[in-house]
Amino acid sequence: MSTLKKNLGYQTVYQILNTALPLITSPYLARVLGATKLGVFSYTQSIAGYFVLLAALGTVNYGTRTIAAIKSNKTEMSKAFFEIYSFQILTSLLSILVYVAYIVLVCKENILVALLQGFLIVGSLIDINWLFFGVENFKVTVTRNMVIRVTTVVLILLLVKSPNDLWIYTLIMSAGTVLSNAVLFYFVPKVVDVSAIKKVNVEGIKKHIKPNLVLFIPLLAMSVYHIMDKTMLGALSTYEQTG
C-alpha cells in the first residue's frame, strides 16, 4: 500500500473517531455538568484560545510547508526544524506570560478553571505536529491522537460526576493536549538529526519570522471568527447561553 493511501486511511479513521466520541461525551457532560458549567468551560477556553493563537502564530502551516519542501535533505530539514521551533518557544513563552498577567489583573471569577485552560498554551509550546505533517508521517500523529482521545473520554466518564467536577473536566482536556504533544518528542530523533540544534543562531531564527507572520494573518481572521461567538456570549450574556 502506498504512503498516500496509508495516510488517507489514518486520517479517515481519526475523523470517524473524532465524530463518534463527542456523541458519547456531549450528552453525558450536558447531564452531569449542566449548561452553566459548560458555558464557563467554553468561555474560558475561548479566552485561552486567543493566547494559543499568539503562541503558535502561523507555525503549523509554515512549518509544514518548510519541512515538506526540504525533507529530502535531512541536514537542512533538521536545522530548519530547530530554527522554527526556537521561534515557536519564544512566542509561546511570551503568550504564557501575557496569559498569567490576564489571570492576575483581569480575571475575577472562575480563576482555577482559567488557570487550567492555560495548559492549552503549554500544549502549543510543545506542539511539533507540523514536523510530522511535513515528512508525511501521519501514523505517529493520528495513532497518538486516537489513544489520547479515547483515554480522555474514559477519564471523563470515570471522574466527572457532578457540576463541582468542572475543574476535573478542564484538567483532563487541557492536560490531554499537553500529553498528546509531549509524546511526539520521543519520535523526533527518528526524524531529524538532533545535533543540528548546535547550528541554530539568531539570524537563522529571524529569517522565519516574516513568512510565518504572513501565514498567520489569514489564520488569525478565521480562528477569531470561530471562537468570537463564545467570547461575546460569555462576556455579554450568561454562561448558560454560552454552554
What is the meaning of each model-derived region?
Residues 32-35, 107, 134-135, 162-163, ...:
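Helix-loop interface residues and adjacent transmembrane-helix termini in multi-pass membrane transporters
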Residues 3-60, 153, 213-234:
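Signature of the first transmembrane helix
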Residues 11, 15, 42-45, 84, ...:
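Residue-level recognition of transmembrane alpha-helices
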Residues 71, 121-145:
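Membrane-interface junctions at transmembrane-helix termini in multi-pass inner-membrane proteins
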Residues 1-4, 139, 166-170, 182-227, ...:
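Interhelical loop/hinge segments that connect adjacent transmembrane helices in multipass membrane
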Residues 54, 93, 100-132:
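Alpha-helical transmembrane segments of multi-pass membrane proteins
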Residues 6-18, 44, 49, 53-103, ...:
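Membrane-water interface segments that mark the loop-to-transmembrane alpha-helix transition
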Residues 111, 118, 143-190:
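Hydrophobic alpha-helical transmembrane segments
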